[in-house]
């Protein structure tokens, strides 16, 4: 039997002071000696994906207590990337991942919690809590707040936008053909309920990946926040975490620990899922960071290898017209994994918090596999309610039928894949010797090979300005540099530049490359995570206006077509500058908090984690 971590604060004479304080929080005498479960919540009124989580912690706590545990809740911060987008607030988004991970570690270790339930949802909160879970390596179950319903149809500029989402609104704002009244109509429809934004953006991508990693329950990534079916996920998570405590502390079963669930094989399966579902490029950053926290040998080369053999089976917004609610109707994550399993494209020998082997999990939950339980079939009938609300579990609508069409439905089988290669592709070349990432699922195949003159800017703001001022011409390659983890600092998302290019009708006529990153809502020929970044001496820092840049997605290359001798001349001139590898004409206030992150931040190929040694 392993001793509970919390014993140092609950058992023995020396713990009298701590017990006195525990009593002041409502702990009863008969609860001392039981496992203390941290309910790691992230409720905030700033974020639609978290606005409904205020009372959800109580549901988990009741389940923990009923199962024999002692629940204690605390909150982390949560940044809304959409609200922070396009201004200085985006500098704080990625660094907040590290703050969240640290705050979870601080609270859990300071108060000697024995296990935790992580109630996450949006872009950096799930990755931050995932990093913490793998760092702490105590029993943990993830249950996110759930996705938002897609917006209703809106007709504007002669086009029926059906259904709408956040990206619809941002793109429409850059279209001269959309008048203010039409834009308001789209805006009012785009985000109708609580929950993480309705497409296959970063938040939903990461919540889906927790299923494949084995740390959350089936349906976690796709069951709508508004649906009554989601309540059971929270209840089950509370019961399950106490069972995991018994297995670990009571039976010395180390298989239930996060590092023994989210193994290298599990990470490979998670990124295979991401390739198949056309997930956000940000998942690359976050899985690399999480693997390092768990001391797991998983790096960009593993992701690159997956992109060569995993087909793209789904195109969800912003890459297509489907939304997460449609993925759910088609069987959710078990259905996608099931399609991969049938072609022997998954790693075997993995398990989850709920199942001792993945095969059993998929047998029970893959509605296309022929063995799915009635419970699984019931869950995937959960449909949107179509009513504006910030309340969770507020409707119980059901789809009349499930989407099992493997040729034309939301989730294809391998024979009808959108492409033989995965939805994400790693590019290399002299511009990105350590790698760059493109969401190939969001790029029209007609521009998979692209060559054009560079249009260089040194901030996202400058990029937006030249696009809206119509200074970008068809055929240009917009280069946004010094926006990497250290150079930004904070590695801003470039959603506004890509959305405004699309809104200006240049979505298939231009490319955009950056050492920054992209929102999960980005589509088009948008290449990010260029490593090394400009601030770390990357070649992107030496590109000049008019230089030819060549992109070849099929051959996975990204190159600056300039003679080596010229490049070396530019490098020598850079090193002679008073402040080499810094922007020349950018006036950006940077706080102490951001400078601290920048001083330790690695480039994107390492997950933009802090390097302390």
Swiss-Prot record:
Its cofactor is [2Fe-2S] cluster; Mg(2+). GO terms for cellular component: cytosol. Transmembrane segments: none annotated. Keywords: 2Fe-2S, Amino-acid biosynthesis, Branched-chain amino acid biosynthesis, Iron, Iron-sulfur, Lyase, Magnesium, Metal-binding. Coiled coil: none annotated. Pathway: Amino-acid biosynthesis; L-isoleucine biosynthesis; L-isoleucine from 2-oxobutanoate: step 3/4; Amino-acid biosynthesis; L-valine biosynthesis; L-valine from pyruvate: step 3/4. The modification N6-carboxylysine is found at residue 124. Binds 1 [2Fe-2S] cluster per subunit. This cluster acts as a Lewis acid cofactor. It catalyses: (2R)-2,3-dihydroxy-3-methylbutanoate = 3-methyl-2-oxobutanoate + H2O; (2R,3R)-2,3-dihydroxy-3-methylpentanoate = (S)-3-methyl-2-oxopentanoate + H2O. Belongs to the IlvD/Edd family. GO terms for molecular function: 2 iron, 2 sulfur cluster binding; dihydroxy-acid dehydratase activity; magnesium ion binding. Functions in the biosynthesis of branched-chain amino acids. Catalyzes the dehydration of (2R,3R)-2,3-dihydroxy-3-methylpentanoate (2,3-dihydroxy-3-methylvalerate) into 2-oxo-3-methylpentanoate (2-oxo-3-methylvalerate) and of (2R)-2,3-dihydroxy-3-methylbutanoate (2,3-dihydroxyisovalerate) into 2-oxo-3-methylbutanoate (2-oxoisovalerate), the penultimate precursor to L-isoleucine and L-valine, respectively. Mg(2+) binds at residues 81, 123-124, 493. PANTHER family: D-XYLONATE DEHYDRATASE, D-XYLONATE DEHYDRATASE YAGF-RELATED. GO terms for biological process: isoleucine biosynthetic process; L-valine biosynthetic process. Its EC number is 4.2.1.9. Homodimer. This is Dihydroxy-acid dehydratase. It comes from the Bacteria. InterPro entries: Dihydro-acid_dehy_C, DihydroxyA_deHydtase, DiOHA_6PGluconate_deHydtase_CS, ILV_EDD_C, ILV_EDD_N, IlvD/EDD_N. [2Fe-2S] cluster binds at residues 122, 197. The lineage of its organism: Bacteria, Bacillati, Actinomycetota, Actinomycetes, Mycobacteriales. The active site is at 519 (proton acceptor). The gene is ilvD.
């Amino acid at each position: 039997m392993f001793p509970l971590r919390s014993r140092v604060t609950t058992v023995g004479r020396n713990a009298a002071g701590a017990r006195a304080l525990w009593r002041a929080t409502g702990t009863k005498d008969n609860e001392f000696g039981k496992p203390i479960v941290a309910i790691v919540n992230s409720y905030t009124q700033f974020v639609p994906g978290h606005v409904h989580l205020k009372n959800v912690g109580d549901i988990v706590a009741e389940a923990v207590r009923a199962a024999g545990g002692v629940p204690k809740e605390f909150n982390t911060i949560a940044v809304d990337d959409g609200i922070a987008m396009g201004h200085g607030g985006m500098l704080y988004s990625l660094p907040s991942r590290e703050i969240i991970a640290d705050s979870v570690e601080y609270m859990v270790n300071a108060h000697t919690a024995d296990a935790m339930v992580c109630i996450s949802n949006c872009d950096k909160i799930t990755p931050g809590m995932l990093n913490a879970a793998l760092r702490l390596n105590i029993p943990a179950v993830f249950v996110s707040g759930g996705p938002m319903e897609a917006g209703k149809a809106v007709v504007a500029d002669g086009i029926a936008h059906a259904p709408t989402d956040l990206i619809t609104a941002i793109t429409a704002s850059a279209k001269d053909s959309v008048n203010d009244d039409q834009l308001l109509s789209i805006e009012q429809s785009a985000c109708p309920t609580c929950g993480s934004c309705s497409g296959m953006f970063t938040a939903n991508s990461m919540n889906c990946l927790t299923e494949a990693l084995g740390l959350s329950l089936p349906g976690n990534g796709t069951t709508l926040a508004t649906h009554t079916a989601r309540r059971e996920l929270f209840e089950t998570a509370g019961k399950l975490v106490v069972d995991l405590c018994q297995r670990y502390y009571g039976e010395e079963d180390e298989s239930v620990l996060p590092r023994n669930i989210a193994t290298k094989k599990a990470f490979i399966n998670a990124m295979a899922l991401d390739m198949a579902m056309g997930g956000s490029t940000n998942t690359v950053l976050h899985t690399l960071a999480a693997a390092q926290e768990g001391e797991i040998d998983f790096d960009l080369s593993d992701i690159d290898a997956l992109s060569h053999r995993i087909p793209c089976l789904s195109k969800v917004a912003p890459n297509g017209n489907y939304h997460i609610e449609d993925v759910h109707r088609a069987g959710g994550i078990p259905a996608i994994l099931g399609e991969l399993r049938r072609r022997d494209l998954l790693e075997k020998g993995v398990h989850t918090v709920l199942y001792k082997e993945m095969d059993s999990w998929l047998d029970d939950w893959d509605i296309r596999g022929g063995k799915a339980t009635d419970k699984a079939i019931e869950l995937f009938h959960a449909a949107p309610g179509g009513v504006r609300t910030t309340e969770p579990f507020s409707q119980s609508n059901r789809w009349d039928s499930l989407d099992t069409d493997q040729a034309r439905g939301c989730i294809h089988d391998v024979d009808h894949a959108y492409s033989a290669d995965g939805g994400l592709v790693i590019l290399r070349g002299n511009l990105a010797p350590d790698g760059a990432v493109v969401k190939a699922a969001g790029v029209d195949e007609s521009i998979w090979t692209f060559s054009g003159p560079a249009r260089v800017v040194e901030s996202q703001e400058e990029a937006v300005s030249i696009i809206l001022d119509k200074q970008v011409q068809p055929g240009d390659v917009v280069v946004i540099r010094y926006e990497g983890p250290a150079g930004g600092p904070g590695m801003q998302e470039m959603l506004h530049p890509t959305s405004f290019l699309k809104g200006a009708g240049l979505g298939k006529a231009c490319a955009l490359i950056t050492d920054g990153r992209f929102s999960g809502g980005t589509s088009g020929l948008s290449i990010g995570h260029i490593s090394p970044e400009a601030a770390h001496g990357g070649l992107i820092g030496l590109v000049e206006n008019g230089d030819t840049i060549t992109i070849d997605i099929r051959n996975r290359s990204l190159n600056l077509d300039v003679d080596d001798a010229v490049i070396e001349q530019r490098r020598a001139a850079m090193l002679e500058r008073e402040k080499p590898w810094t922007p020349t004409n950018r006036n950006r206030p940077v706080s102490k908090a951001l400078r601290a992150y920048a001083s330790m931040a690695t480039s994107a190929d390492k997950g933009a984690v802090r390097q302390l040694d």
